[in-house]
Amino acid sequence: MSGPQHITILGATGSIGLSTLDVVARHPSRYQVFALTGFSRLDELLALCVRHTPQYAVVPDQFVARKLQDDLAAAVLDTRVLVGEGGLCEVAAHPRVDAVMAAIVGAAGLRPTLAAVEAGKKVLLANKEALVMSGDLFMQAVRQSGAVLLPIDSEHNAIFQCLPGDFARGLGAVGVRRIMLTASGGPFRETPLEQLQNVTPEQACAHPVWSMGRKISVDSATMMNKGLELIEACWLFDARPDQVEVVIHPQSVIHSLVDYVDGSVLAQLGNPDMRTPIANALAWPARVDSGVAPLDLFRIGQLDFQKPDEERFPCLRLARHAAEAGGSAPAMLNAANEVAVAAFLDGRIRYLEIAGIIEEVLNHEPVTAVEGLDAVFAADAKARLLAGQWLERNAR
């Protein structure tokens, strides 16, 4: 290796960004932070810049940029501050960047992630919404640019590790019968259905296994997160929706499985810590220490599996239907979910109304073909408008 890889971290102050920085800091001769971006936790972004001395930082607006630039100057740092989506795309596609951690949550991460792909970077994809929204357009860009796309979601990273290196020839060609996505079941896996009506945001964010941000914690509680991962798996591994099965596995030790036609089932196991898939993708095809403790099977004792209940988890059903419909449906599903989850976290709707909003949006609009990025964002905007109108009529 001639020198350290230069890394841009999109979404540096979130849980994935912080875990990435933890792994990077363990290997200073391998990795050097080139750019960090943040949206709301700007004091933390300043602290990260002081600690990791990136060449660039990106923030959402000019007011914040001026303050951060002054604070960096006071700390005797020459980090340059960029602004907005243009700044995100610049640090994602910069010629000096080798790898990009795409960890901005939601639709906001699509353009900068695509910028990294189109520049032919090694893209560590934690922003599942980018692929859910743009699907075939995203994968076409990967193929045309020669970018290396490595999944960071623990489930997709597990599948990637369990598939043969030439899986791009087609799952059937390499003997794969099905992919099994594991899910913890979230905090309400055994909650009586009649109690779900009164679930609070704090309860929904109290995940029993993983430490995550608030939006993805709610998605995990509703199992929309698993639904989005189902759609993501279809695009990453060229699978049909009926080739992807969701299995509830409360211990979150098996991160996913691949079932082969000869009866073999390969699984990837590990402690539930995002530093494992991050380290795997950063170093791929090599391996480096992630800082994660070794798995102790004797302490775990047993592994359990359950079939998801669609009455309890209607968002999983809606996501599978969107995957089967294709076209604009996944982008609309994602947008409606983002609006509904934000309203729930703000106390404007009840937990069970999240799925209701999404279903109403999907039923309102016919599925259309998505032939360009403008069509993706048009579907996204339409779904947000419809979800917003529902809130105007019904929110508390």
Curated annotation (Swiss-Prot):
The molecular function terms in GO held by this entry are: 1-deoxy-D-xylulose-5-phosphate reductoisomerase activity; manganese ion binding; NADPH binding
Any one of the GO BP annotations: isopentenyl diphosphate biosynthetic process, methylerythritol 4-phosphate pathway involved in terpenoid biosynthetic process
SUPFAM superfamilies assigned to the protein according to its UniProt record, in alphabetical order: 1-deoxy-D-xylulose-5-phosphate reductoisomerase, C-terminal domain, Glyceraldehyde-3-phosphate dehydrogenase-like, C-terminal domain, NAD(P)-binding Rossmann-fold domains
Q: Name the Pfam families for this protein.
A: DXP_redisom_C (PF08436), DXP_reductoisom (PF02670), DXPR_C (PF13288)
**Keyword ATP-binding assigned:** no
Any idea which positions bind 1-deoxy-D-xylulose 5-phosphate?
Answer: K128, S154, E155, S184, H207, S220, N225, K226, E229
Q: From the UniProt record, give the pathway where this protein acts.
A: Isoprenoid biosynthesis; isopentenyl diphosphate biosynthesis via DXP pathway; isopentenyl diphosphate from 1-deoxy-D-xylulose 5-phosphate: step 1/6
Looking at the keywords, is NADP present?
yes
EC numbers: 1.1.1.267
- InterPro entries (alphabetical): DXP_reductoisomerase, DXP_reductoisomerase_C, DXP_reductoisomerase_N, DXPR_C, DXPR_C_sf, NAD(P)-bd_dom_sf
The reaction(s) catalysed by this protein are: 2-C-methyl-D-erythritol 4-phosphate + NADP(+) = 1-deoxy-D-xylulose 5-phosphate + NADPH + H(+)
Q: Where does NADPH bind?
A: T13, G14, S15, I16, N127, E129, G213
This protein's cofactor list reads: Mg(2+); Mn(2+)
The record lists Mn(2+) as bound by: D153, E155, E229
Key words, A-Z: Isoprene biosynthesis, Manganese, Metal-binding, NADP, Oxidoreductase
Q: Which top class of enzyme applies to this chain?
A: oxidoreductase
What PANTHER family does the entry give? Answer: 1-DEOXY-D-XYLULOSE 5-PHOSPHATE REDUCTOISOMERASE (PTHR30525), 1-DEOXY-D-XYLULOSE 5-PHOSPHATE REDUCTOISOMERASE, CHLOROPLASTIC (PTHR30525:SF0)
What is this protein for, i.e. what is its function?
Answer: Catalyzes the NADPH-dependent rearrangement and reduction of 1-deoxy-D-xylulose-5-phosphate (DXP) to 2-C-methyl-D-erythritol 4-phosphate (MEP).
State the NCBIfam families in the record. Answer: Dxr, PRK05447.1-1, PRK12464.1
Checking HAMAP family in the record gives:
DXP_reductoisom (MF_00183)
Q: Please report which protein family the annotation says this sequence is part of.
A: Belongs to the DXR family.
**Protein name in UniProt:** 1-deoxy-D-xylulose 5-phosphate reductoisomerase
Species the sequence originates in: Pseudomonas savastanoi pv. phaseolicola (strain 1448A / Race 6)
Q: What are the leading ranks of the lineage?
A: Bacteria, Pseudomonadati, Pseudomonadota, Gammaproteobacteria, Pseudomonadales
